[in-house]
């Protein structure tokens, strides 16, 4: 199946989504109140923290399993409630610091959608951006496997909530619609919680940068993993020409390549003229906001092996551990 990028124009002005879609607006507590004993609850990347906190405050539940892809404060709160079982593919620093326990689910990011279809939750909650006047709901800073939670075939009594984060950018690409949700959760947020743990800046990069310079030719398509080493190293390749970007995570280093003109996406064979990703880090938000050169897509598109292989001169830069 071919995936086609859709373009939705952002509408400026004083549009109030809570007034326009008032019949759908609920509080985190009201949404969490819909969870029943015995339910499987699945959430998004990034986590819908306010919903998870409200759910963690419930003491009347039994045998409830909560899937949180990358637990932050909300996931840690779930783990502290003995009536709830936290499941996650990643055990984050916040969980470790809270001495919280979770069952590890060995599922790759590109398989989260299929995992949700095979393990359908009765209640799903995904973080989204601010709804637009035409009913379009931008995905916010990530889609990852969130699309499957929203668009999967539902059984009777299944519920899907969208927690609206007003501080994430409007990113072009895939999107939802208000009709996809049973309710939209309103919570005044002061800032966007990071998706990943803090990355440290590496030192002594010269050997690594020299190797990358030789391995990444002009016109190559680049993918970068999360990590201070790869991000900083890529940002030093601004002398390159006509690079393309097809990646899992849009990070500082890739953004710097676009800002410098080194990455133009002009020669890309898949999604030409577009930077494509499924997760955006906070340091890229201002750059991505209403930037038509950048498109967000589901993980099963960004990480599809055949799609990656079809890209021109694909180069993937990721960290690895060597045990000596």
Language-model features: locations:
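Conserved alpha/beta enzyme-core scaffold
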Residues: 2-321
């Amino acid at each position: 199946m071919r995936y086609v990028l859709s373009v939705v124009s952002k509408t400026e002005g004083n549009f109030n989504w809570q007034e326009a879609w008032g019949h759908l607006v609920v509080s985190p507590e009201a949404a969490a109140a819909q969870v029943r004993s015995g339910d499987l609850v699945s959430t998004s990347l990034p986590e819908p923290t306010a919903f998870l906190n409200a759910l963690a405050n419930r003491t009347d539940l039994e045998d409830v399993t909560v899937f949180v892809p990358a637990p932050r404060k909300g996931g840690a709160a779930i783990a502290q409630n003995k009536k709830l079982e936290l499941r996650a593919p990643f055990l984050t620093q916040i969980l470790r610091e809270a001495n919280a326990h979770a069952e590890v689910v060995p599922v790759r990011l590109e398989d989260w959608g299929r995992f949700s279809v095979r393990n359908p939750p009765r209640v799903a909650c995904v973080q989204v951006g601010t709804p637009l006047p035409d009913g379009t709901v931008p995905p916010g800073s990530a889609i990852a496997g969130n699309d499957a939670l929203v668009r999967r075939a539902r059984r009777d009594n299944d519920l899907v909530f969208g927690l609206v984060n007003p501080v994430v950018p409007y990113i072009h690409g895939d999107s939802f619609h208000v009709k996809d949700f049973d309710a939209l959760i309103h919570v005044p947020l002061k800032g966007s919680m990071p998706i990943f743990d803090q990355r440290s800046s590496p030192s002594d990069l010269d050997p690594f940068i020299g190797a990358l310079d030789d391995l990444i030719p002009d016109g190559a398509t680049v993918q970068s993993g999360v990590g201070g080493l790869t991000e900083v190293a890529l940002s030093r390749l601004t002398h390159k020409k006509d690079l393309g970007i097809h990646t899992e995570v849009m990070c500082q280093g890739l953004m710097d390549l676009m800002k410098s003109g080194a990455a133009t996406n002009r020669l890309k064979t898949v999604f030409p003229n577009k930077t494509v990703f499924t997760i955006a880090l906070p340091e890229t938000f201002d750059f991505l906001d209403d930037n038509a050169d950048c498109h967000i897509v589901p993980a099963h598109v960004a990480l599809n092996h055949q799609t990656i292989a079809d890209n021109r001169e694909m180069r993937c830069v990721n960290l690895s551990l060597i045990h000596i």
